[in-house]
A protein has these predicted regions:
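Active-site loop of classical SDR/Rossmann-like NAD(P)-dependent oxidoreductases
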Residues: 35, 223, 247-267, 280
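N-terminal Rossmann NAD(P)H-binding glycine-rich loop of SDR-like oxidoreductase domains
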Residues: 3-20
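Amphipathic terminal alpha-helices
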Residues: 271, 279-347
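NAD(P)-dependent short-chain dehydrogenase/reductase
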Residues: 137-184, 189-198
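Adenosine-cofactor binding site in Rossmann-like domains, unifying the SAM/SAH pocket
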Residues: 21, 27-45
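Catalytic helix-loop patch of NAD(P)-dependent Rossmann-fold dehydrogenases
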Residues: 72-87, 107-149, 153-156
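Mid/C-terminal beta-alpha module of Rossmann-like enzyme folds, strongest
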Residues: 195-196, 202-255, 296-304, 308-309
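NAD(P)H-binding glycine-rich loop region in Rossmannoid oxidoreductase-like domains
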Residues: 40-82
Length: 347
């Protein structure tokens, strides 16, 4: 088995490379600044030279707000998320190489109350979501041997601005912060990389498992619940934040484009097909915060160590932070969402 990871500098790409480095799997990694996917001849040349048995595309443009308001950003979003996927799909078809492609829950409109299934109808409402959906659509048309893995919002130590901004805002505003009132299932990029690696191994065994799959961490949450979780964990490492947390007040903002109300996915199909189980996001949150605060990981305590057990019990007994939740109505009517160019059911 030999893999080509395209999108090496994305957070998912970084986590995938980290995992692959600890295996005996041969792989090469490229990013968009090393290979211009808008030049088909260069793509064919690069893929032919590397000669992989599978291509994993985790390249993405994911700045939702910028893609919605900046024409140049929107163009770049389309180039990477749609045109780039088309180019890679054509090369993979030409060279008979299976392609595993990372996509997003933002191909949906967020109006469903339950988690989204693979068979649910796509109806993206923002530029980013449309670019991901059009990329999926062309991949299905161009390459039969494909797997599309949709995930919800990813986080990692490699891209930790959300965590940093959240902590900084909480400190600067004496515990008063604002978040969008949406429901999602934040997933550590390392967990998503684990899933891709599990898929790769079964594809290498010639498993006929082509199609679309969903994965995200266990238990969808409202964003204010996730914020509280992050801040409570951060407070264990930050004395200043720990003092502020008892007065935490979270203001809930209305969901407006480019965001969607619900982006959580049902991951039962991937379990049934590949035997891949959902993991909790908790360890991932802890890992990111330890990276931010420069915590060095120590060896786990030996069983029977009474001091370690007492310390752990004290941590578990830490009282839950009580928050004030304030829902804010939109100041102006929400803009109507233009329909996607085409909606279809997935297989």
């Amino acid at each position: 088995m030999k893999l080509l990871v395209f999108g090496a500098n994305s957070q998912l790409g970084q986590e995938l490379i980290r995992l692959l480095t600890d295996t005996e799997i041969e792989f090469s990694a490229l990013d968009t600044d090393q290979l211009d996917v808008l030049k088909p001849k260069e793509v064919v040349k690069a893929v032919t030279r590397i000669n992989p048995t599978q291509l994993i595309n985790v390249s993405t443009y994911s700045n939702l707000q910028k893609a919605e308001t900046d024409p140049q950003a929107a163009k770049r979003c389309d180039q990477i998320n749609t045109d780039g996927v088309t180019a890679l799909a054509r090369v993979c078809k030409q060279l008979n190489i299976p392609i595993i492609h990372h996509s997003s829950s933002y191909v949906f409109d967020g109006q469903k109350k339950e988690t989204y299934d693979e068979e649910d109808e796509a109806n993206p409402v923002c530029s980013y979501g449309k670019s991901k959906w059009y990329g999926e659509r062309t991949l299905r048309e161009e390459s039969e041997k494909h797997i599309i893995l949709r995930t919800d919002w990813l986080f990692s130590a490699y891209r930790n601005k959300y965590f940093l901004n959240l902590i900084d805002s909480c400190k600067k505003n004496a515990g008063k912060i604002s978040v969008v009132d949406n429901r999602f299932s934040p997933t550590h990029a390392g967990d998503a990389a684990r899933v891709i690696l599990g898929i790769v191994k079964q594809v290498d065994c010639n498993a006929e498992v082509w199609g679309t799959y969903h994965y995200n961490a266990m238990q969808a949450v409202n964003q204010d619940q996730f914020v509280l979780h992050v801040l409570e964990e951060a407070a264990k490492l930050d004395a200043e934040l720990d003092k502020i947390l008892p007065s935490l007040e979270i203001e809930l903002l209305p969901v407006e484009r480019p965001y969607i109300r619900n982006s959580a996915l049902n991951a039962s199909k991937i379990m049934g097909t590949f035997g891949i189980k959902q993991h909790s996001r908790g360890p991932g949150v802890t890992a990111v915060l330890e990276e931010i605060y420069g915590v060095k990981k120590e060896k786990p305590p030996v069983q029977g160590n009474s001091a370690a057990i007492a310390s752990d019990n004290e941590s578990q007994a830490r009282p839950k932070t009580k928050t004030k939740r304030k829902k804010v109505s939109a100041k102006k009517p929400r803009q109507s969402m233009p329909p996607a160019k085409k909606a279809a059911k997935q297989k």
